[in-house]
Amino acid sequence: GAYHHITVVGKEDAFCDHIYDVTGSLCENNDKFAIDRKLPKIDIGDRIVIHDTGAHGHAMGFNYNGKLRSAELLLREDGSVELIRRAETLDDYFATLDIPGGLMKPHA
């Protein structure tokens, strides 16, 4: 139950009169950023900023369920955004895999 600060881009000063659950992408019942959180009305196409992503960020992240780590962006005080870590690729995920030669023989 860690608290994650969440804002809706462009609606920072809007009245928080809607209740949402904000969840992660894993198939786990505890992959939640917020439950019953009051936020401004969120429309399709709105961007949500989760200011502190915990285990979804690189520092605590891992490839659970084969999930690739997301890109990380830095939101500067002047409102500009900068990519500080690119998203992982499948090549990254399998880069350390080293299967011994005879292990992958087809069954007769």
Give the location of each predicted region.
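Charged (often Lys/Glu-rich) extended helix/loop segments that serve as interaction or gating elements
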Residues: G1-A108
